[in-house]
Amino acid sequence: MWMVGLAVMAGCTAVPKDASTTDLSVTPWAQQSSLQDGQWRHYALPGKASSQFAYTRKDGRDAMAVTAMSSASMVRKQVRVEPTELGSVRFSWKVPELIAQADMALREADDSPVRIVLAFEGDRSRLSARNAALSELALALTGEEMPYATLMYVWCNERAAGSVIVNPRTDRIRKLVVESGRGKLNRWLDYERNIRADYEKAFGEAPGALVGIGIMTDSDNTRSSARAWYGPVQLPLASRSTAVR
């Protein structure tokens, strides 16, 4: 359960629980996203208010609408794509406003109106003592280790597109800025990213298997609010070799 890794890294001491109130997998948004036979589920973080996720039509598009009110949670899906089969990831989002106080390099201000989250396996013998301890804590809590690495695509207030931000809690979470500043607010933005190239840019090594995909809008650290719409998330070049766990 790679969501557990995010919970441990966020300072949570309990296991994330399934926070679903509806089956998100039956929505047109989920059916257009990668691996249509898998389940997109909403997961809460212990001690955190949950952001609200709901399917909607936005500007003629199928979308997942998200509202965060001093909250943080994720909609995610478990997948498996072997390193040799990694291709691209396609996603889109629309953001009406940035979080003015946010700074993803600071623990106390690490919020973002949009995040696309990719979780990976890897050579765990290379983990630092601190990261190994975090992984052991996750294993003790859940019976499963945290991901070896997590890559997030984010929209940053000031850092330039292409910047890599290391998570203030652990260097096994890194954020790649794909949008910056206010210039493209209030419009749909579409992306296709090379997973391998972006992982290598962020971590300086080749990726392991991709084991999870998620979307996340959070405003808990800044005690603020955020809204966003996400289009379907797709793995167009890897779909033939993926499998839901």
Task: Describe each region flagged by the PLM.
Residues 107-114, 145, 228:
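Short coil-to-beta strand junction motifs in C2/discoidin
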Residues 114-116, 171-181, 185-223:
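Extracellular beta-strand ligand-recognition surfaces/modules
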Residues 52-74:
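Short carbohydrate-recognition loop motifs
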